[in-house]
Design a protein with these regions (language model features):
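Macrodomain-like recognition of ADP-ribose-binding/processing modules
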Residues: 1-197
Length: 197
């Protein structure tokens, strides 16, 4: 959603409502978490699931070097980096490293208790918010398609995105904040990614 071309869009199909917001992932998650507080007691226990556009081999991407992509931003505003740098998470990064490809894998991690402590401007929040975070890496296309066809690339993206959505559904998450999966530094085509979603 470019600022000039942005239109607030929400579509309801059956029981699914989806939309496009030109917003910070954690800001939108905080807003949605507040809205969920008005739901029934059963649903109050539900947390928002935020997609972390993860680096496949470096925990937190370049957050410790001052990089400014979405993952680094999430890490600076929350407790997420503690989880990503844990020994349990190391398996994810080691596995992706072992593949010796910029495409990464369909592997993902769920961090169920991430405390958001800063707003979109970096200010400390008066009241922190707990969300869940799904970390998954899009293929890095900085070096092109590495010898695969466009159809194979689309199949790979379809599998990865479907895996994320199936995991969220299996774990019972009903409210997801997704992002421009791989459409920044990883150079995936936003039209292809949005079509697959």
């Amino acid at each position: 959603c470019a600022d000039k071309a942005y239109k607030h869009v929400y579509v309801t199909e059956g029981r699914i409502e989806f939309g496009c917001e030109n917003a910070d992932s954690f800001e939108l998650a905080r807003q949605m978490q507040k809205e969920m507080a008005y739901l029934s007691d059963r649903d109050k226990k539900q947390t928002v699931l935020v997609l972390n556009l993860a680096n496949p081999v470096h925990p937190g991407g370049g957050v410790r070097r001052g990089a400014r992509a979405q993952e680094e931003d999430l890490c600076r505003k929350s407790s997420l980096l503690l989880s990503l740098e844990s020994s349990a998470a190391r398996k994810y990064y080691d596995y992706n490293s072992s593949l010796h490809t910029y495409f990464g894998s369909d592997a993902l991690m769920i961090t169920p208790q991430v405390e958001i402590i800063r707003d979109e401007k970096g200010n400390l929040l008066q009241d922190s918010v707990i969300v869940s975070v799904m970390s998954c890496a899009a293929p890095m296309l900085c070096n092109g398609l590495e010898g695969i066809t466009d159809a194979q690339y689309r199949d790979m993206m379809f599998g990865r995105i479907t895996g994320m959505l199936k995991t969220a559904a299996y774990l019972g998450y009903q409210v997801l904040v997704l992002g421009a999966f791989g459409c920044g530094a990883f150079r995936n085509d936003a039209h292809i990614v949005s079509d697959i979603f």
